[in-house]
UniProtKB/Swiss-Prot annotation:
GO terms for biological process: translation. Keywords: Ribonucleoprotein, Ribosomal protein. It comes from Methanospirillum hungatei JF-1 (strain ATCC 27890 / DSM 864 / NBRC 100397 / JF-1). This is Small ribosomal subunit protein eS8. Gene3D superfamilies: 3.10.290.70. One of its GO terms (molecular function) is structural constituent of ribosome. Part of the 30S ribosomal subunit.
Amino acid sequence: MQWQGRSVRKSTGGRYSPSRGKRRREIGSAPAETHIGIDRRKISRTYGGNNKVRALRCEYAAISNAKTGETKKVKIETVEENAANPNYVRRNLLTRGAIIRTELGRARITSRPGQHGVINAVLIE
């Protein structure tokens, strides 16, 4: 877990003296790192008692075709390009903005699998 807070150092290099310790609500969570595989999801409690569905593995994506206006559930074959990190292509990690190869062709992921629990994509070829 990582604390998503202010830096301990000032711009001059000095240290801020903490007025209090960390709170549970201020601690972030580890990235979901969604892979290609048989569907596996995890439900985690978030701030305010709400739930967040994290996709750990996904096999299918809902791909929309802008020309015809229809959406189909299509199997994901592989990750071809990922602007977030070149290593994600080798590891076949699914993130928002990644370009995936499917049975219909190439598509760009528009949803956030680690936050939404589903993979929505737009056909680009």
